[in-house]
Design a protein with these regions (language model features):
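Nucleic acid-binding interface residues in structured DNA/RNA-binding domains
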Residues: 2-159
Length: 159
């Protein structure tokens, strides 16, 4: 996100944007990719509420949060683009608050990847995760990415 210091992320977090809502998709490739046509859109605050549930020493992926919302709401899947945006909004909103912190650093991208769009970037997320006992590994030579080693073993079960 750009110009984070000029944005009110807490206002964005509480703007439901006419969500929750459902949409039926008709594109056959998307239906095959996501396993159905019923797509759920969760509001930003719902991502924040789920992210707050992740305890010290545990992690979650955005994909697992999306699966949880779909299952909870009788959808085939949760829309992926807004999911990524809303997770970032929750992170920045927490960063802007002086209380009621959301432990956003525990929410990872696919395959346990760290999220460079969080406040402080990769380095800040890496520092916080390592402080909770996680090992961070680097992958790639030119397009370097960072991951929580064996993240599957410390995934939090939302159910």
């Amino acid at each position: 996100m750009a110009n984070e210091d000029k944005k009110d992320f807490n206002a964005m977090l509480h703007d439901s944007k006419d969500m929750p809502k459902f949409q039926t998709i008709t594109d056959q490739k998307s239906i095959e990719k996501y396993g159905g046509s019923r797509m759920y859109f969760a509001p930003p605050i719902d991502y924040d509420k789920v992210m707050k549930r992740i305890p010290y020493g545990k992690v979650i992926t955005v994909g697992k949060i999306r699966e949880y919302f779909a299952e909870l709401n009788g959808a085939d899947f949760t829309e992926p683009i807004t999911a990524g945006i809303f997770v970032s909004i929750a992170a920045w909103a927490s960063y802007q608050r002086s209380e009621d912190e959301t432990p956003y650093w525990r929410t990872l991208k696919a395959n346990g990847e760290l999220n460079k769009k969080y406040p402080g970037g990769i380095e800040a997320q890496k520092e916080r995760l390592e402080a909770e006992g996680h090992t961070i590994i680097q992958k790639g030579r030119t397009n370097i990415k960072y991951f929580v080693k064996d993240y599957e073993s410390v995934l939090f079960d939302l159910r």
